[in-house]
């Protein structure tokens, strides 16, 4: 009798271990979700749908986290509509898509992780969520159709190479309290023509805007303390730099730039 009770207890505990992760299916869509400290987390999507609307799938409408590599290297999806209360997109979640064209993000997303949309060459994205606080490293690296123009107000960190080679970006307005623009964050954005820097900016790091070949002039904020190695290197159209402070400027910060006027 005692052995029987122990066996039942063990079986019950084993069942509990499996509860956090649920494999679910709806039609031709296949996915796995689990509980996390932030709420429901999508672990993996294995469907072949061309359009994925989380809000139309009962089991996914309350997802708070898109997990690491959840959709990585998908070749079917063209459009994603993320759930209304999503908070976190983990690293490599939508990395290296062949056909992804549009992603609709709700104004609840706080964090987009490293390489989350890396090398999504067909992705056309013009607006980031107002709720966004942090953008990881290589997040939109080589997404040459991404054309955002405003960095949201609450973004406190932009990782290295976050927007490298985003050729669709023509203007950048930093509406935030960002203090550092990290290494190569916007390097190779060859159609970038205009930048409005944030008022609290302290540092423009190495190669941050290197090879932005259509950038013609910049007005640097009074808060700026440092301009790094080749920060504007090979900006071959850059003619005008206005200083409103006396930052420490690396001797190669403007290498191969035809800067003719500095104040």
What annotation goes with each model-predicted range?
Residues 18, 138-141:
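Tryptophan (W) side chains
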Residues 23-27:
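Boundary at the C-terminal end of the N-terminal hydrophobic targeting segment
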Residues 67-70, 90-93, 113-116, 136-139, ...:
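Consensus positions within tandem repeat domains that build extended binding/scaffold surfaces
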Residues 28-37, 47-65, 75-88, 98-111, ...:
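Structural signature of tandem-repeat unit edges
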Residues 10-20:
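Bacterial N-terminal signal peptides
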Residues 1-11:
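Bacterial N-terminal signal peptides that target proteins for export
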């Amino acid at each position: 009798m005692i052995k029987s009770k122990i066996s039942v207890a063990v079986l019950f505990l084993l069942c509990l271990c499996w509860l956090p992760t649920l494999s679910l299916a709806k039609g031709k869509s296949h996915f796995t979700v689990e509980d996390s400290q932030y709420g429901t987390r999508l672990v993996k999507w294995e469907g072949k749908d061309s359009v994925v609307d989380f809000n139309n799938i009962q089991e996914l409408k309350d997802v708070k986290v898109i997990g690491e590599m959840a959709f990585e290297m998908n070749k079917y999806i063209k459009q994603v509509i993320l759930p209304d209360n999503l908070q976190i997109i983990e690293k490599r979640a939508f990395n290296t898509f062949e056909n992804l064209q549009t992603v609709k993000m709700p104004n609840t997303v706080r964090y987009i992780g490293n390489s989350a949309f890396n090398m999504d060459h067909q992705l056309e994205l013009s607006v980031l969520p107002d709720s966004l606080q942090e953008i990881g490293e290589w997040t939109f690296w080589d997404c040459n159709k991404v054309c955002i123009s405003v960095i949201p107000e609450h973004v406190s960190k932009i990782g290295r190479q976050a927007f490298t080679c985003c050729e669709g970006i023509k203007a950048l307005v930093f509406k935030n309290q960002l203090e550092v623009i990290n290494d190569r964050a916007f390097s190779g954005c060859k159609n970038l023509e205009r930048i409005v820097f944030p008022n609290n900016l302290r540092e423009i790091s190495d190669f941050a805007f290197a090879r932005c070949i259509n950038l013609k002039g910049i007005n640097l904020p009074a808060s700026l303390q440092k301009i790094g190695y080749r920060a504007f290197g090979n900006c071959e159209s850059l003619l005008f730099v206005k200083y409103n402070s006396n930052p420490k400027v690396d001797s190669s910060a403007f290498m191969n730039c035809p800067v003719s006027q500095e104040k």
